C-alpha cells in the first residue's frame, strides 16, 4: 500500500476541498464500491444506485465541512448520506428491478453470483433461484430490508449496523429477526408457486 493510500480520510478530504483532484480520486476509489453495493441492494436499480452515489460525492465536494471527524468516520458519514438518498428514492419510485449481474466500474455487483453450471438447464434454474431471492429481499419493507442487507449480505456486526443506521442494537436485532422471517415466508411462497415449464423446440407434440 502506498503512502497516499494510507492517508486518513479527513486529510484527503481537506486536500480535495482545496481542489486536489488526486485526493478526491483516492477518496472516491476508497468508498465508492461499498456505497454502490449498498445502494444497489436497497434500491434494486443499478442506474439509480450509480446516480445516488455520484450525488453523494458531489454533495461532499460542494461542502466538505458537512463532515465532522469528531462525530465518526468519513465512511460512516457517506453511508448515512447514501442511506437518506436511497430512502428518498424508494419513496418516489417504489417499483424495483431484480439486480442479477449489475457491475460498477470496479467490478462490484449486487453480491449474489451466478456460478458456472454444466448445462443451460442448470444455469436457468440457478438464475431463477437468484431472481427469487432478490425479489424476496426487495419486497421487504425498507427498515427490514436494510437490516438484512447490512447484517446478512454485507456481514456487518449488530454494533456496526446500529451505528450506521443510528438506532439501538436491540432495534437492529428485532428488525433483522423480522426481516429474516418475512424473507423466509416470501421464499416459501415463491418455491411453492406453480412453475412454468418451457419445452425445448424439438420436444413438440407428435402428430
Residue ranges and their predicted role:
Residues 134-171, 185:
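Helix-turn-helix DNA-binding module
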Residues 37, 51-58, 72-84:
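Structural recognition of an alpha-helix C-terminal capping motif at a helix-to-coil junction
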Residues 17-18, 41-44, 55-73, 92-94:
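Sigma70-family region 2
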Residues 31, 175-178, 182:
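Residues within the DNA-recognition helix of helix-turn-helix
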Residues 5-6, 96-126, 157, 197-206:
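Internal acidic/polar
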Residues 28-46, 63, 79, 137, ...:
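Amphipathic, Lys/Arg- and hydrophobic-enriched alpha-helical face
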Residues 62-69, 80-101, 126, 178, ...:
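Arg/Lys-rich amphipathic alpha helix in sigma70-family domain 2
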Residues 1-3, 15-26, 36-55, 160:
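Short, charged helix-capping/linker segments at alpha-helix termini
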